[in-house]
């Protein structure tokens, strides 16, 4: 799907291991799972933190992968 999308962490719950990123371009909020956070070498995401990510689709739903801190 799309690559190098800029977004802001809307919320991330490290207990539930997921959250959502608000796309800077105004698109739909994107699901982010702990596996993507771990793969980026991060421990967690903070609300309001800017990230760059790629979109992938699985079972008809978009989710963030290849996270990088902006």
UniProtKB/Swiss-Prot annotation:
The cysteines covalently paired via disulfide bonds are none
Which keywords does this chain's UniProt record carry?
Activator, Cytoplasm, DNA-binding, Transcription, Transcription regulation
Report the domain of life of the source organism: Bacteria
Cellular localization per UniProt: Cytoplasm
Outline the extent of the CSD domain: 7-67
The record's annotation in SMART domains points to: CSP
Q: Know the name of this protein?
A: Cold shock-like protein CspA
UniProt xrefs under InterPro entries: Cold_shock_CspA, Cold_shock_domain, CSD, CSD_CS, CSP_DNA-bd, NA-bd_OB-fold
Q: What SUPFAM superfamilies does the entry give? A: Nucleic acid-binding proteins
Sorted alphabetically, the Gene Ontology cellular component annotations on this record are: cytosol
